[in-house]
Amino acid sequence: MKPSSSNSRSKGHAKARRKTREELDQEARDRKRQKKRRGHAPGSRAAGGNTTSGSKGQNAPKDPRIGSKTPIPLGVAEKVTKQHKPKSEKPMLSPQAELELLETDERLDALLERLEAGETLSAEEQSWVDAKLDRIDELMQKLGLSYDDDEEEEEDEKQEDMMRLLRGN
């Protein structure tokens, strides 16, 4: 028996069937319809985009339309003035304690040594030294002290010692 010719054609190279005009038009309409539907689905912003099926409650997706919960003033309101915290005032030192602090100030000592050595200070340093020396003078006047008291007392003691020596002999 001879094999049928129809079977041999189907197994071999099949000739591509040409599409009719109606089929081509239908495919073109389908392609156009698909092309129109590209992009985001309508209402995707309101729907939230991600639709994960999960248990409602804690894991519920948040609505992207809901923003910050801070209240926004709608009318003109008075300006709110913030009260500044008062700076912690330095504890009031007694004049004696303040004088001791100024006399033991390392920066003041260093600048005075530079002045004695003949160096010139910057305007800022000079004004700082002048202010500190003025404060020392004020404190010494309050306490009834002076620079010359120590020297005069030493001279007075020397004179008294001399007088005692002269009288004693």
Swiss-Prot record:
UniProt source species: Shigella sonnei (strain Ss046)
Biased composition (Acidic residues): 147-159
Pfam families registered for this protein in UniProt: YihI
Protein name: Der GTPase-activating protein YihI
Bias (Polar residues) ranges: 49-58
Similarity field: Belongs to the YihI family.
Renumbered residue ranges of the record's region Disordered: 1-100, 144-169
Domain of life: Bacteria
Keywords for the protein's UniProt record, in alphabetical order: GTPase activation, Ribosome biogenesis
Coiled-coil residues: none
Its biological purpose: A GTPase-activating protein (GAP) that modifies Der/EngA GTPase function. May play a role in ribosome biogenesis.
